[in-house]
UniProtKB/Swiss-Prot annotation:
It is found in: Cell inner membrane. It holds the Pfam family LGT. GO terms for cellular component: plasma membrane. The keyword Transmembrane applies. Its EC number is 2.5.1.145. Belongs to the Lgt family. It is a multi-pass membrane protein. Catalyzes the transfer of the diacylglyceryl group from phosphatidylglycerol to the sulfhydryl group of the N-terminal cysteine of a prolipoprotein, the first step in the formation of mature lipoproteins. This is Phosphatidylglycerol--prolipoprotein diacylglyceryl transferase. The gene is lgt.
Length: 277
């Protein structure tokens, strides 16, 4: 059994300016996206293309800029609407109080989809081509976010057996019983494992939409599994069929990914060009 080490959430204090570990995890996520996006330019069907439909570093920078806005706005709105709609309908101005915390992955995903729609329209590229480019670059950012969750000592897991060697006591959770370190599980599953599988899969030319579909299914399944060990939000608890809100939100992701895969399987192999598919 392990004891959660109290970690100062402030990484660096310069006068009145406090730099938090959680903010640094977001910065790391965006930096990793930029690095991997530039590497992604070497993968088919993006490598070796010239002309108006060719992908460049400038495209990666623009997607990152739009994606940051999508993650922050979508993640915040998703948290407010999916998890505490009654509260924020009564306190609408607190939606903008980002410093109070409260972000939701599924809301951030919707925000990123809107960002990709904007980018695809402005560049006259197929949306699925954009989604295929972005998808393999996302899991490392999710991993960085889970590191931030662990440092903050938040989103801990459900109670674990006292015999579990890596069971961890989060004293600030109000109980001295060991819990599953679900932040670590999610770091390993939806972060590292999903990245390795998706990155290897995306290195070969696939039909347009298949890489994005693999992300939706892969994340949905791995998050669903991880939610089995994560303590449900206290204000929601366990919902219908014994599932958490996170698990319910994963179901449309998985279904959408399967449908997209079936649709993509009927397409011809993807070609990176400027015209719409």
């Amino acid at each position: 059994m392990l004891i959660y080490p109290p970690i100062d959430p402030v990484a660096l204090q310069i006068g009145p300016l406090a730099i938090h570990w959680y903010g640094l995890s977001y910065l790391a996520a965006f930096g990793l996206f930029m690095l991997l996006g530039c590497r992604r330019l070497r993968h088919p069907p993006f490598a070796g293309r010239t002309g108006p439909g060719a992908w460049s570093r400038k495209d990666v920078e623009d997607i990152l800029f739009l994606g940051v806005a999508g993650v922050v706005l979508g993640g915040r709105l998703g948290y407010c609407l999916f998890y505490k709609p009654d509260y924020y309908l009564g306190h609408p101005l607190e939606v903008f109080a980002l410093w109070q915390g409260g972000m939701a992955f599924h809301g951030g995903l919707l925000g990123v989809i809107v960002a990709m729609l904007w980018f695809a329209h402005s560049r006259q590229r197929p949306l699925l081509q954009v989604a295929d480019f972005v998808a393999p670059c996302v899991p490392t950012g999710l991993a960085a976010g889970r590191v931030g969750n662990f440092i903050n000592g938040e989103l801990w897991g459900r109670f674990a057996s006292p015999d579990l060697p890596w069971g961890m006591v989060f004293a600030h959770s109000g109980s001295m019983q060991p819990r599953h370190p679900s932040q670590v599980y999610q770091f390993l599953l939806e972060g590292l494992l999903l990245f390795v599988l998706l990155w290897l899969y995306a290195r070969r030319e696939r039909r347009q939409g298949q890489v994005a579909a693999a992300f939706l299914v892969g994340y949905g399944v791995l998050r669903f599994i991880a939610e089995q060990f994560r303590e449900p939000d206290a204000f929601l608890g366990i919902l219908a069929l014994g599932m958490s809100m996170g698990q319910w939100l994963c179901l449309p992701m998985i279904a959408g990914g399967v449908l997209l895969w079936c649709r993509a399987a009927r397409r011809r192999p993807a070609v990176a060009r400027g015209s719409r598919a």
